[in-house]
């Protein structure tokens, strides 16, 4: 039975749109939570398996295959078992993200796709919050105090604020090719008055580096100064496993 949700989940709909034109196949919703993402992606015909540590939160036991899974340990799936893996708002919670991303690569088929999202800590809104509060957007609660709350709250503990450059490094060094960078919804246009200063600083940094024979920042600056990174609520990255070509 379909469960109606009158409030639009922009992140969910964006992830669904990134898969809309892909060939249907076996999809793992890792860290599925209540299962809304799994249910949404099952509708257009994906063969969905949902996986999470807490089965009690999952709402679709009669409709979707659920697997109890501790993401901190090796995943309970064979090599190259899935065509697609999604991990929405998961990586910021992980204590050992390198091991987890390596496991995702292992269970993906050649040229399989992985879509992940995480709070966008490089947005203008987040940068200004850090300036005034000393904390980034979605990382306002002190982890030590929050960790003393009941166990169900610990599942929502944000540990690592992922900037795009570090996330890109993690993915590429785990055997993935970046295919696209997206966001869920744009916000914070009112903070655009600081944009000229940010653009000038980025230009100066790139210029000084090249002048001294250092790094070439032009590629990464194009990403960091994109509207997705400056005004997006979430950072969504779509990657493909090495070993195949798109559509292969």
Q: For the regions a protein language model found, what residue spans apply to each?
A:
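Acidic, Ala/Val/Gly-enriched low-complexity intrinsically disordered segments
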Residues: 245-246
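Conserved SAM-binding loop
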Residues: 14-20, 25-130, 236-241
């Amino acid at each position: 039975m379909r469960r109606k949700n009158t409030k639009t989940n922009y992140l969910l709909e964006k992830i669904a749109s990134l898969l809309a034109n892909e060939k249907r196949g076996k999809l793992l919703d890792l860290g599925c939570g209540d299962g809304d993402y799994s249910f949404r992606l099952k509708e257009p015909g994906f063969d969905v398996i949902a996986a999470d540590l807490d089965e009690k939160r999952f709402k679709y036991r009669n409709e979707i295959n659920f697997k109890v899974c501790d993401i901190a340990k090796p995943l309970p799936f064979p090599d190259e078992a899935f065509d697609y893996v999604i991990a929405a708002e998961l990586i910021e919670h992980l204590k050992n993200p390198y091991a987890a991303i390596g496991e995702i690569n292992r269970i993906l088929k050649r040229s399989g796709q992985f879509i992940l999202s995480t709070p966008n800590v490089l947005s203008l809104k987040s940068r200004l919050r850090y300036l005034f509060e000393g904390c980034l957007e979605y990382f306002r609660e002190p982890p030590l105090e929050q960790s003393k709350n009941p166990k169900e709250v610990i599942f929502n503990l944000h540990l690592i604020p992922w900037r795009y450059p570090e996330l890109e490094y993690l993915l590429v060094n785990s055997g993935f090719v970046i295919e696209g960078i997206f966001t869920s919804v744009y916000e914070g246009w009112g903070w655009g008055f600081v944009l000229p200063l940010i653009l000038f600083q980025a230009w100066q940094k790139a210029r000084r580096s090249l002048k001294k024979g250092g790094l070439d920042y032009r590629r990464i600056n194009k990403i960091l100064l994109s509207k997705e990174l400056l005004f997006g609520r979430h950072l969504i990255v779509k990657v493909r496993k090495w070993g195949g070509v798109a559509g292969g």
